[in-house]
Amino acid sequence: MSTLYVAGPMTGLPDFNYPAFFDAERELRAAGFDVLNPAREEGRDGCTQWLDFMRASLRDLADCDGVAMLPGWGDSRGAALEVHIAWSLGLRAMPVQSWLREAAS
């Protein structure tokens, strides 16, 4: 099964929007996907600046087969960058619900 990277807004949101990332991860795993959740990934403890976090996230994104987008991704500078890079690399990027519908069909 494909490995999906979860992209969505974090900055300025309560709890960095982590609950939405964890919900998406749970649903995508239940549908059979492997999931790379930047809210969970190791090695981000030392990331105190946005640039540091994005460097780590973009390295992870490059190892995935597609991107599962959370609501509000287009209003997030980081998530929009992740999706743009995914598309530029030829990876599929769709809302989480689209991946779930596709897996169910």
Where are these regions (language model features)?
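Conserved catalytic or regulatory cores that recognize and/or transform ribose-phosphate-containing ligands
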Residues: M1-S105
